[in-house]
């Protein structure tokens, strides 16, 4: 009789511990997915040039990037992310360069890129280093409203890429 009671007690304790571990795992995974969602939202806000409005009426507003006469480097954003490594183990990065102006075309887009190089060929008609810290998007050609250029490169480290110069139509 005592053995049966001891086994029931041990089983009950084991079940309770398993439930506690499972609930803790759910809480932890909920926090990480929540923070991942916040991070994705923040990245998307940067990508789309959305900023938080802390005015009394609250809400969000779009930063105006619509008039060609307000041409600036801010009309183009560079978004860079880790991608799958090459079979050789070399890290790969995906890059998206986007004209966020919805009413203007940009051209002659130059990106500061250090000594950009890639273990895998990047299509030079899309992105090409033309000098130290100077890379050219689409050979200087036009990037229409909301148009994007995407490519991947492979190197042991990510290059800091930033818009250096643009012209607008």
Curated annotation (Swiss-Prot):
Xref: InterPro entries: TPD1
UniProt xrefs under Pfam families: TPD1_C
Expression sites (tissue/organ): Expressed in roots, and at low levels in anthers during meiosis.
SS bond partners: none
Keywords from the UniProt entry: Signal
Signal peptide span: 1-25
One annotated GO biological process: cell fate determination
Function, in words: May play a role during anther development.
Protein name according to UniProt: TPD1 protein homolog 1B
Organism whose genome encodes this protein: Oryza sativa subsp. japonica (Rice)
């Amino acid at each position: 009789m005592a053995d049966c009671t001891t086994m029931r007690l041990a089983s009950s304790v084991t079940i309770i511990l398993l439930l506690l571990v499972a609930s803790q795992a759910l809480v932890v995974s909920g926090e990480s997915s929540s923070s991942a969602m916040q991070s994705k939202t923040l990245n998307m806000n940067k990508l789309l040039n959305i900023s938080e409005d802390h005015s009394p009426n609250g809400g969000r507003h779009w930063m105006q990037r619509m008039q060609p006469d307000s041409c600036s480097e801010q009309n183009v954003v560079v978004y860079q992310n880790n991608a799958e490594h090459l079979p050789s183990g070399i890290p790969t990065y995906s890059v998206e360069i986007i004209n966020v102006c919805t009413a203007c075309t940009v051209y002659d887009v130059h990106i500061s890129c250090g000594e950009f190089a890639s273990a895998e060929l990047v299509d030079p008609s899309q992105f090409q280093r033309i000098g130290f810290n100077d890379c050219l998007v689409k050979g200087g050609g036009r990037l229409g409203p909301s148009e994007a250029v995407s490519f991947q490169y492979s190197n042991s480290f990510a290059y800091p890429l930033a818009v250096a110069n643009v012209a607008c139509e």
